[in-house]
Amino acid sequence: MSWLLGYVDPTEPSFVAAVLTIVFNPLFWNVVARWEQRTRKLSRAFGSPYLACYSLGSIILLLNILRSHCFTQAMMSQPKMEGLDSHTIYFLGLALLGWGLVFVLSSFYALGFTGTFLGDYFGILKESRVTTFPFSVLDNPMYWGSTANYLGWALMHASPTGLLLTVLVALVYVVALLFEEPFTAEIYRRKATRLHKRS
C-alpha cells in the first residue's frame, strides 16, 4: 500500500473531494434511513412511504453520480503509474468494470427501486429476502459490484490514486454493512415470525 502513496498528493482538492463524497454517501443514507425507520417523518412529510423512498433514492443516485465524478477528477489530477499503463491492465480493468456492472444492474433488477434504496427502512418489504442471482452467488452484490466498477476504472486509467480511493470505497462499504446487514436480517426475521403466528 505504501508504494501507492508516492503517487498520491492527499492535499490536492479533487482528491479531498473524492474522499469526502466516498465517506459521506453511505453515512448520509444510513443516518437518514435509520431516522426514518424510528420516526416515519419522511413518510408523513411526503404523504406516502413510497414517495419518501423514491425521493431519498433519487438523492442517493445524484450523490453517487457526484462521487463518481469526484473519483474521476481525482484520478485525472494525479500521475499515472507506468507499470499499470499497459493494454493487459487496461483490458483487465475493462473486464472488472463489466463484471461490476452485471452485479450492480442485476441487483437493481432483483430488488427493484425500493429494495435497492432502503425501502425496508420505510416499511416497504418484499415477500422474503431476495436469494436469486446475483444474491445466489455473492452477498451484497450491489456494493461489491460498485467496488469492482471503481477498481476497473482505476486500472483502465493506470491510476494509483484510483486504486487508493477504491480501497476506501471498499472499507466504507464494509463499515456500512456492519449496520445494514443486522437490520435487514432482523426485519425479515420479524416478518417471518408474524406470518408464522398468523398461520
UniProtKB/Swiss-Prot annotation:
UniProt topology in membrane: Multi-pass membrane protein
One GO BP: positive regulation of cold-induced thermogenesis
Chain ranges on the Cytoplasmic side, renumbered to this chain: 67-93, 179-199
InterPro entries: PEMT/MFAP, Phopholipid_MeTrfase
GO MF term (any one): S-adenosylmethionine-dependent methyltransferase activity
Key word Endoplasmic reticulum present: yes
Residues noted as binding S-adenosyl-L-methionine in the record, renumbered to the chain: G98, W99, G100, E180, E181
Location relative to the cell: Endoplasmic reticulum membrane; Mitochondrion membrane
TM spans (from-to): 46-66, 94-114, 158-178
Tissues showing expression: Expressed in liver (at protein level).
Pathway membership: Phospholipid metabolism; phosphatidylcholine biosynthesis
GO cellular component: brush border membrane; endoplasmic reticulum membrane; mitochondrial membrane; sarcolemma
Intramembrane region spans per record: 13-33
Source species, domain of life: Eukaryota
Activity-pH behavior: Optimum pH is 10.
Pfam families xrefs: PEMT
Lumenal side of membrane: 2-12, 34-45, 115-157
Catalytic activity: a 1,2-diacyl-sn-glycero-3-phosphoethanolamine + S-adenosyl-L-methionine = a 1,2-diacyl-sn-glycero-3-phospho-N-methylethanolamine + S-adenosyl-L-homocysteine + H(+); a 1,2-diacyl-sn-glycero-3-phospho-N-methylethanolamine + S-adenosyl-L-methionine = a 1,2-diacyl-sn-glycero-3-phospho-N,N-dimethylethanolamine + S-adenosyl-L-homocysteine + H(+); a 1,2-diacyl-sn-glycero-3-phospho-N,N-dimethylethanolamine + S-adenosyl-L-methionine = a 1,2-diacyl-sn-glycero-3-phosphocholine + S-adenosyl-L-homocysteine + H(+); 1,2-di-(9Z-octadecenoyl)-sn-glycero-3-phosphoethanolamine + S-adenosyl-L-methionine = 1,2-di-(9Z-octadecenoyl)-sn-glycero-3-phospho-N-methylethanolamine + S-adenosyl-L-homocysteine + H(+)
Family according to the record: Belongs to the class VI-like SAM-binding methyltransferase superfamily. PEMT/PEM2 methyltransferase family.
HAMAP family: PLMT (MF_03216)
Function statement: Catalyzes the three sequential steps of the methylation pathway for the biosynthesis of phosphatidylcholine, a critical and essential component for membrane structure.
Protein name: Phosphatidylethanolamine N-methyltransferase
Organism of provenance: Rattus norvegicus (Rat)
Gene it is expressed from: Pemt
